[in-house]
Amino acid sequence: MRKVVIVGGGFAGLSVARGLARERDVEITVLDERNYHLFQPLLYQVAMAVLSPAEIAAPIRGLLSRNSRTSVLREKVTAVDLKQRRVIGEDASHEYDFLVLACGVRHCYFGNEHWESHAPGLKTLAQATEIRRRVLEAFEEAESESDPT
């Protein structure tokens, strides 16, 4: 049985896991910091209070539950040992025959982190709910404004 480790439970990682699930001689392990898949294209809807966070996040295990040879582990990967063919996480290491890195991206201010308070990222549920909080707070402040202009 060939062991495949997929780092990342986003669109790319899930697509690879689903495609490989058709193979009979493959054991798949998906590693992700979170235990849910986030449908990022709708994060703006959470930020604008149109959708709730639960409406755009689904458990990764549930999405991949059809294949008994697929396991999903909540694991933050800290290193990859290419010579020993191991992925090293905060809690454990995982051996592989094939490795797929589908980690996604993080918001970057190119060394200008002070911009974050004025231009927050929109890549996570925490960021979306913080933007939502700011928008709703601005509406509340506007309601109590005595000068309408």
Model regions: which residues?
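Beta1-alpha1 glycine-rich phosphate/pyrophosphate-binding loop at the start
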Residues: 1-71, 149
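FAD-binding core/adjacent interface of flavoenzyme oxidoreductases
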Residues: 70-149
